[in-house]
């Protein structure tokens, strides 16, 4: 008998929120599951997701993802109403929920979605506890990034 080959997909990442790292200081990251409908899973397999404006809100002791857009496919089911901007429940442990809820209420943090990816057959969302950056902080980050690139370029030419 032949051995079964391990399936290795190209990339597990579905969507990233690059703007979140630019606008916020990310203090801590959590991995959360996502409660989805069938048409949403099919759209995510096609890569039709956008989480650039998404954030997490708490209602009745549960966490929900707001602002994430999952565009339905043209061949989506006709008997189900496809709502792209629907709020989706995040699946977290009670301890994680309590920790996030406490930090948001007491310490003034916000919770933003950083990335959406596949983990085996499940869709996971990486969420981050974040604090907003001021304009001068953003400029400092840009300056540091540019200096890092210049330094690498200088070192490359110095070694020749």
From Swiss-Prot:
Keywords carried by this UniProt record: Cytoplasm, RNA-binding
Give me the Gene Ontology terms describing cellular component. Answer: cytosol
Q: In Gene Ontology terms, what is one molecular function of this protein?
A: RNA binding
The record's Gene Ontology biological-process terms are: trans-translation
Which PANTHER family does the UniProt entry name for this protein?
A: SSRA-BINDING PROTEIN, TMRNA-BINDING COMPONENT OF TRANS-TRANSLATION TAGGING COMPLEX
The job of this chain, per UniProt, is described as:
Required for rescue of stalled ribosomes mediated by trans-translation. Binds to transfer-messenger RNA (tmRNA), required for stable association of tmRNA with ribosomes. tmRNA and SmpB together mimic tRNA shape, replacing the anticodon stem-loop with SmpB. tmRNA is encoded by the ssrA gene; the 2 termini fold to resemble tRNA(Ala) and it encodes a 'tag peptide', a short internal open reading frame. During trans-translation Ala-aminoacylated tmRNA acts like a tRNA, entering the A-site of stalled ribosomes, displacing the stalled mRNA.
The name this protein carries in UniProt is SsrA-binding protein
